[in-house]
């Protein structure tokens, strides 16, 4: 019995299900049968193929074969153009290197043969030989002049290829959406496309070989021509030297003419090398110009932000400089347009400010220059109590400069410099711990020490500073209470030393004799000491402090003991018995109930 048969029996037994099935259309019945159809697993069929394919979907758009082929052709053309441009640039570089090497070789050969010709300057050469040398020089100049336009044409071709590649990229960007919609191809058409691409790649290889062959031929020709010209020059020079040796020096003017001809040849060569350098420089500038285009708007934005920043921070800067009483806090946290120059100006303005107590510049890209300016400001400023330097670019040098300035500052109580771009390191942490030993006012330090040693020492130093601040507060309270008690005593002293009611009132005009009599009495008799002040409240404060520092259990025990001081009659009797002797006690008869 299969599962389907069992399910059908259950369905037939249930009348409600039968009625539901009767209402279904034939299409719905087919779907239901497909879902209920359970096939026994076959071991020979892979697991992924045992179920029916539930991922079959209809194509979202129609396939355009022509668009696909056009796209493949454009892409192959772009690749060919890129490779051609790269090959041409390499060939131009090789040609220029070969020319430079030939020029160096010719210059060296001329230098070697120069002293021989100079030694034979006084001798008279033939006119035909001179004409031949001039004609050869002209031919070399003409050949080099013809090579220049060739190189310029090659460079122009490279630039044209780059322009075409840029235009093709723009066209490809416009047509990209249409081509992406048509990119869903079938397997057969993919095969045809791959075959065509293979054919195009073969065409590319052929073109490369064709381009390389003429380039190699040109290089071989150039080397052969250079060798032939060098050989001709050497032969002509040898002939001239032989003829000069045979003849005697008759005229000296001819030697001067040969020198002038050499100078002219050198000038011509220099002029030929200069345009080559100019062509190279133009190529470099063209390569550098394209990236400079998109950088212009970014430079303009940066300049606009720098110009806008001073306008935003001008008012607070003026308030800080003018010591405005309302300006008690300078907060420039997370400002994008602020620069290090503006931060330095703020610190310079705060140097002589006596109102601002909080200076916060977190996440403002402040560097060591700002840190050094803050250190100078802390040495002079005696009002700032909080400084926030979180999330900046300050290094260990700037932080140590700030801590050295704290040795001369006794007002800063909070300093935060966590999450800097550069890690402080163990050395700076040790230096911070050493410098904090001499500071007694810093109470809060916003930094997580990586080393355990400096971390423990700094926590102990901060707790020490907290205790010192608490002791100072207590002393100030005592002094204030003592001052208030002295004022009360001064007010009560005249009442004690007042005259009795029956004594006559002194006259408004004092007698002249009374002054000299009173002065010796005051000098001889010591003044009466002031009465002792009343008991002060500090003991109560100390008791409260003791209670606050003692644990709760001891306080409860103490509270319970206090009411026990009032003794009952029984306690009094027991105390009397303990203090009495046996002689004082009287014998008492035992009561009858206890007998």
From Swiss-Prot:
Ranges for region 8 X approximate tandem repeats: 165-288
Tissue: Detected in smooth muscle, in stomach and uterus, blood vessel wall, and in slow fibers in extraocular muscle, urinary bladder and sternothyroid muscle (at protein level).
Biased composition (Basic and acidic residues): 72-105, 117-127, 134-193, 201-224, 232-251, 259-289, 467-476, 484-493
The keyword Phosphoprotein belongs to this UniProt entry's keyword annotation: yes
Gene3D superfamilies the record matches: Ribonuclease Inhibitor (3.80.10.10)
Biased composition (Pro residues): 503-513, 527-538
A GO CC term assigned to this protein in UniProt: myofibril
Record domain WH2: where: 569-588
TM regions (residue ranges): none
Region span, Disordered: 1-322, 467-568
Region (5 X 4 AA approximate tandem repeats): 503-522
Primary residence: cytoplasm
Sequence repeat feature ranges: 165-180, 181-196, 197-212, 213-227, 228-243, 244-257, 258-273, 274-288
Biased composition, class Acidic residues, residue ranges: 27-40
Cellular compartments annotated: Cytoplasm, Myofibril, Sarcomere; Cytoplasm, Cytoskeleton
Keyword entries, A-Z: Actin-binding, Cytoplasm, Cytoskeleton, Phosphoprotein, Repeat
Protein purpose: Required for proper contractility of visceral smooth muscle cells. Mediates nucleation of actin filaments.
Protein name according to UniProt: Leiomodin-1
Gene from which the chain derives: Lmod1
